[in-house]
Amino acid sequence: MSARGKARNRALDVLFEAEQRSLSAFDVLRSRREKTDQIVNPYTLEIVEGVVSHQAAIDEFLETYSQGWTLERMPSVDRIILRIGTWELLYNDDVPDGVAVSEAVALAKTLSTDESPSFINGLLGRLQQLKPSLLA
């Protein structure tokens, strides 16, 4: 797994734990740093900060374009993967659009249900098509 792939995976862990425990993602990061004295990968931190700062808009896009699904109905891990993928797709110009989608699908293949990769691919693919109008 690439360094960025590991960073995505760690960001997913942080965001997932924060959601499950009703904590701030930054509190989870701080707690992990204190417990392990590990240096947090800068890209992990960038993802967490990006998702947190754009979460309202990201969630609105996901609610609007996930046909027949609400965020609450989605498996938690899918919701977090979609938030990371949407942030990379719409708000991080350093990641090519296709890479953002394929990396999100790869996370879903290893961490979620059998149906999740195609759902995530379809939803992020739709957001990729609409990207110019979403950011206008």
From Swiss-Prot:
Gene Ontology BP terms: DNA-templated transcription termination; transcription antitermination
Cited Pfam families: NusB (PF01029)
Keywords: RNA-binding, Transcription, Transcription antitermination, Transcription regulation
GO molecular-function terms, A-Z: RNA binding
UniProt xrefs under InterPro entries: NusB-like_sf, NusB_fam, NusB_RsmB_TIM44
Gene3D superfamilies linked to this entry: NusB-like (1.10.940.10)
GO cellular component, one term: cytosol
Role played: Involved in transcription antitermination. Required for transcription of ribosomal RNA (rRNA) genes. Binds specifically to the boxA antiterminator sequence of the ribosomal RNA (rrn) operons.
PANTHER family reported for this sequence: ANTITERMINATION NUSB DOMAIN-CONTAINING PROTEIN (PTHR11078:SF3), N UTILIZATION SUBSTANCE PROTEIN B-RELATED (PTHR11078)
NCBIfam families registered for this protein in UniProt: nusB (TIGR01951)
Family under the similarity heading: Belongs to the NusB family.
Protein name as it appears in the record: Transcription antitermination protein NusB
Species in which this protein is naturally found: Arthrobacter sp. (strain FB24)
